């Protein structure tokens, strides 16, 4: 599984961007919960989810800065 490209994120509108951020945060929470309860999980998904979240937050921040 490869990392998602930032060009995919820049094409999203503001509402879907905010929705995607919530989805990724929920995925990270679920992964942490699985790790804490010693359930089966794929550790590489932490890195992928964090990378995706960083991309989403970067685009969101740049959009809010550009409107100021």
UniProtKB/Swiss-Prot annotation:
Q: Which Gene3D superfamilies match?
A: 1.10.287.310
This entry's Gene Ontology molecular function terms read:
structural constituent of ribosome
Entry keyword set: Chloroplast, Plastid, Ribonucleoprotein, Ribosomal protein
* Main localization, broad class: plastid
The record's CDD domains line, in alphabetical order, gives:
Ribosomal_L29_HIP
Q: Identify the InterPro entries for this entry.
A: Ribosomal_protein_uL29 (IPR050063), Ribosomal_uL29 (IPR001854), Ribosomal_uL29_CS (IPR018254), Ribosomal_uL29_sf (IPR036049)
Q: Which Pfam families match?
A: Ribosomal_L29
Q: Which GO terms describe its cellular component?
A: chloroplast; cytosolic large ribosomal subunit
* One biological process term in Gene Ontology: translation
Compartment(s) where it occurs, according to its Swiss-Prot or TrEMBL record: Plastid, Chloroplast
Query: Family assignment?
Result: Belongs to the universal ribosomal protein uL29 family.
Provide the protein name. Large ribosomal subunit protein uL29c
Source organism of this protein record:
Pyropia yezoensis (Susabi-nori)
Q: What is the lineage of its organism?
A: Eukaryota, Rhodophyta, Bangiophyceae, Bangiales, Bangiaceae
């Amino acid at each position: 599984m490869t990392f998602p490209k930032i060009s995919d994120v820049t094409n999203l509108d503001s509402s879907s961007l905010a929705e995607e951020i919530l989805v990724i945060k929920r995925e990270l929470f679920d992964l942490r919960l699985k790790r804490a309860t010693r359930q089966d999980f794929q550790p590489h998904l932490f890195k992928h989810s964090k990378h995706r979240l960083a991309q989403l937050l970067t685009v969101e921040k740049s959009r809010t800065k550009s409107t100021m």
